[in-house]
Amino acid sequence: MADIKNYTLNFGPQHPAAHGVLRLVLELDGEVIQRADPHIGLLHRATEKLAEQKTWIQSVPYMDRLDYVSMMVNEHAYVMAIERLLGLEVPLRAQYIRVMFDEITRIMNHLMWIGSHALDVGAMAVFLYAFREREDLFDMYEAVSGARMHAAYYRPGGVYRDLPDTMPQYKASKVRNEKALAALNQTRSGSLLDFIEDFTNRFPKYVDEYETLLTDNRIWKQRLVGIGVVSPERALNKGFSGAMLRGSGIEWDVRKKQPYEVYDRIDFDIPVGVNGDCYDRYLVRVEEMRQSNRIIRQCIEWLRKNPGPVITDNHKVAPPSRVDMKTNMEELIHHFKLFTEGMHVPEGEAYAAVEHPKGEFGIYAISDGANKPYRLKIRAPGFVHLAALDEMAKGHMIADAVTIIGTQDIVFGEIDR
């Protein structure tokens, strides 16, 4: 009788658990994975090359579209790289607003992760709960920028505008009765800070709900404990960062170890795993949501007490106010030059890294003194994590590959760029 050889299976790119456009070529022995070969590039949009044809400020919206679940954090790394090249001082209020929205974005990302990860494993309820909370976070984005996803809110030298004093209200429609409308607008009667504070009061209870459903759930633990184990040494050698590295027991967080903006003024803890498996990475991310909530509350407290400018007054970098522009010819010229020719960034190179929800997201920008980047290199954390999929999945069942992809928190916008 002929020997039964390993067979090859295509997983994705149109698989519901492939997190976008991942194509995995799996070499199987029965149902056991011998080799996993990720094929990338199906969402490649040449972002790095496009940035070379655009002025420095025109590339901000492209950053939103890299990891399209963590929009503002991508922008943050990019504007920080420009600020380092310019040697620009950012107003303190703008720094606090950035930190607050970074953490709002982190919660937004982790809600998407916990919902889709649980859905992949077979728990549908968490996905629906997570999207209930994300709706409030999208409303926060919409209040400051007018856009629910691709905000383009951060600017070199600060942020686009200050936090609004009123929240947008839901309007009556054919699909909403008076009772539903009143419930939706109940928390929207005050300012944006009031709305965010109300959310931070409610959010810990929501995280408790997710933990009640998952943390001690027998099926959840059977599917995650001991799956995709990565030792601290291998995690470092593979270039892991973020929750993937902390889940393996290494206490590394860019916000603590290389503080940027005002993270050195804020009190928070770094959750760290022990076993380096999918379950530990789950626990780390859940605790990260609680810590982000804590950071947001500290930012709200500071922002309430300290009004001030939210963008630099250097009009070669940031536009003048509309009032000044309409009354002063010089300001009008600044505005015209900035949005036609763009700003000229001094010759040099800079690397800016932020603690992205998925790991260390870095922008390496090289300027030749022109109004466009000479070269822009994007360091995507998910790219490194996906490269380790073969090692993490070897010897596991095919169903465990879904769990491992979920625990890596893969989004292809940043991997394919």
Curated annotation (Swiss-Prot):
Q: Which GO terms describe its molecular function?
A: NAD binding; NADH:ubiquinone reductase (non-electrogenic) activity; quinone binding
- Catalytic activity annotation: a quinone + NADH + 5 H(+)(in) = a quinol + NAD(+) + 4 H(+)(out)
Topology versus the membrane: Peripheral membrane protein
Q: Which GO terms describe its cellular component?
A: plasma membrane
**What does UniProt give as the signal peptide span?**
none
Q: What class of enzyme is it?
A: translocase
Decide whether keyword Cell inner membrane is in the record: yes
Q: InterPro entries, from UniProt? A: NADH_Q_OxRdtase_suD, NADH_UbQ_OxRdtase_49kDa_CS, NDH1_su_D/H, NiFe-Hase_large
Documented EC number(s): 7.1.1.-
Q: Which keywords belong to this entry? A: Cell inner membrane, Cell membrane, Membrane, NAD, Quinone, Translocase, Transport, Ubiquinone
Q: Which cysteines are joined by disulfide bonds?
A: none
**Where, subcellularly, is it found?**
Cell inner membrane
Q: Which PANTHER family match?
A: NADH DEHYDROGENASE [UBIQUINONE] IRON-SULFUR PROTEIN 2, MITOCHONDRIAL, NADH-UBIQUINONE OXIDOREDUCTASE 49 KDA SUBUNIT
General function of this protein: NDH-1 shuttles electrons from NADH, via FMN and iron-sulfur (Fe-S) centers, to quinones in the respiratory chain. The immediate electron acceptor for the enzyme in this species is believed to be ubiquinone. Couples the redox reaction to proton translocation (for every two electrons transferred, four hydrogen ions are translocated across the cytoplasmic membrane), and thus conserves the redox energy in a proton gradient.
- Complex and partners: NDH-1 is composed of 14 different subunits. Subunits NuoB, C, D, E, F, and G constitute the peripheral sector of the complex.
UniProt record similarity statement: Belongs to the complex I 49 kDa subunit family.
Q: What is this protein called?
A: NADH-quinone oxidoreductase subunit D
- The species is Ralstonia pickettii (strain 12J)
